[in-house]
């Protein structure tokens, strides 16, 4: 029989090297797509409920802040849900740093949003800065319809496999 220390030594010898070149940096929404469970707890029906809750939290934040008084949820099909409110709408003007519409920044960049300080919302629910971008990352298709500043904006985002 083999001793424990020599067995452990054999395992160690068989392992390949582990160096800085093995360290990955995931960007954009890639971390969510690779490890959805880290963000929504899994990939089962409860995870889908979590995604719905993230969108609903945004509508409820508008209600609690006094900017909306109506939220509608519609089950369109087994895997499609519509959530709407009469709140302010996601900003669509260009973000000062990224030079693209703020809605695009919010939908495609983790840790972006208007809830980190108390300037926009005194209280808020959900995963601040990751909620709606996680929903986008894990949705086959996500359509935003935003009525803001007397204009109507529509943007459809689709899951693309490269």
Model-derived features: positions:
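N-terminal amphipathic, basic-rich helices that act as targeting or association modules
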Residues: 19-26, 47
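Single conserved hydrophobic/aromatic residue that forms the stacking wall/gate
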Residues: 1-12, 160-161
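Acidic ATP/Mg2+-coordinating residue in the GHKL
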Residues: 85
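Conserved ATP-binding N-box helix of the HATPase_c
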Residues: 46-67, 131-136
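Flexible ATP-lid and adjacent glycine-rich G1/G2 motifs of the Bergerat
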Residues: 40, 88-147
């Amino acid at each position: 029989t083999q001793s424990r220390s020599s067995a452990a030594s054999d395992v160690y010898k068989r392992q390949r090297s582990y160096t800085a070149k093995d360290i990955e940096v995931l960007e954009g929404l890639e971390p969510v797509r690779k490890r959805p469970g880290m963000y929504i707890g899994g990939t089962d029906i409860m995870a889908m409920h979590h995604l719905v809750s993230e969108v609903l939290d945004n509508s409820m934040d508008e209600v609690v802040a006094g900017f909306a008084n109506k939220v509608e949820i519609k089950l369109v099909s087994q895997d499609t849900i519509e959530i709407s409110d009469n709140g302010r709408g996601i900003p669509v003007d260009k973000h000062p740093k990224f030079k693209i519409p703020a809605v695009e920044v919010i939908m495609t960049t983790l840790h972006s949003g208007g809830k980190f300080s108390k300037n926009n919302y005194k209280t808020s629910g959900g995963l601040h800065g990751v909620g709606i971008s996680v929903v986008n990352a894990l949705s086959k298709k996500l359509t935003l319809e935003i009525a803001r500043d007397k204009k109507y904006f529509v943007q459809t985002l689709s899951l693309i496999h490269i």
